[in-house]
């Protein structure tokens, strides 16, 4: 479903940071300022967000993987919830350096987590001493928190969706190194450099974060649904062709 200007206004997408903290590279997206707070031009944001959704839709239709990244307190739950709804991986606790550039190491940790989860399923905890079980539970909880969202990510993602590029500089840098497209919310205090699909907007408001994440998740689901419909229609077309020539 398309996001509207009214929804963006209600979510506070237009509220930037204090004028003294601004990044001049965001000047083209700033409408003005009020009470020393920069106001983002939603007439720029809305079409740019629509472009980002269009790209996401196409990527999802081609079975692409989009990694959701949002580790700030106000975005953690929403990022996990919307990524899961869209069937995509996510990082919402802390970005571990090398998550993409050193994927081999991440794969080792993922294997460890999956092995531990399998052990729990098999009832192995009951065979351990209290101390062993406690240490085991602590380790599995730590792994689930840090990499639980990426445990089913088979390889480097086809794109990453980031809320707050300043807070996730390492993630953006890793994506840039690997040539992975970056879709990101960029507030007035950060630079849009290194971002392929810039979404100028408030990156602190939980309502705004929910709007972005829901919009991206919706686009992914739409892209997948469109791809399925095309396959079904193509199959029907083949059937009709066969019937006509039977």
From Swiss-Prot:
What PROSITE patterns has UniProt attached to this entry?
RIBOSOMAL_S2_1 (PS00962)
Which keywords are on file for this protein?
A: Ribonucleoprotein, Ribosomal protein
UniProt GO cellular component terms:
cytosolic small ribosomal subunit
GO process terms (BP): translation
Read off the InterPro entries from this record.
Ribosomal_uS2, Ribosomal_uS2_bac/mit/plastid, Ribosomal_uS2_CS, Ribosomal_uS2_flav_dom_sf
Which CDD domains does the entry link to?
RPS2
**SUPFAM superfamilies attached here?**
Ribosomal protein S2 (SSF52313)
GO MF, one term, reads:
structural constituent of ribosome
Regarding protein family, the annotation reads: Belongs to the universal ribosomal protein uS2 family.
Quote the protein name from its UniProt record: Small ribosomal subunit protein uS2
């Amino acid at each position: 479903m398309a996001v509207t200007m009214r929804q963006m206004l209600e979510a506070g997408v237009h509220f930037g940071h204090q004028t003294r903290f601004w990044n001049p590279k965001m000047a083209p997206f700033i409408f003005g300022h009020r009470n020393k707070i920069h106001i983002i031009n939603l007439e720029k944001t809305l079409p740019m967000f629509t472009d980002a959704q269009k790209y996401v839709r196409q990527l999802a239709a081609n079975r692409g993987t989009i990694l959701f990244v949002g580790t700030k307190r106000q975005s953690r739950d929403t990022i996990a919830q919307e990524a899961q709804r869209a069937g995509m991986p996510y990082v919402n606790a802390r970005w571990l350096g090398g998550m993409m550039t050193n994927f081999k190491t991440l794969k080792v940790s993922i294997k460890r987590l999956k092995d531990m989860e399998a052990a729990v399923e098999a009832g192995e905890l009951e065979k351990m001493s209290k101390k062993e079980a406690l240490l085991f539970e602590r380790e599995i909880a730590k792994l689930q928190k840090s990499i639980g969202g990426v445990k089913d990510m088979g390889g480097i993602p086809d794109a990453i969706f980031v809320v707050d590029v300043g807070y996730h500089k390492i993630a953006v840098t890793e994506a840039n190194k690997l040539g992975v497209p970056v879709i990101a919310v960029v507030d007035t205090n950060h630079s849009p450099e290194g971002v392929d699909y810039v979404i100028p907007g408030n990156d602190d408001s939980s309502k705004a974060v929910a709007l972005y994440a829901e919009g991206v998740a919706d686009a992914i689901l739409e892209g997948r649904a469109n791809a399925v419909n095309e396959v079904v229609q193509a199959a029907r077309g083949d059937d009709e062709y066969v019937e006509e020539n039977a």
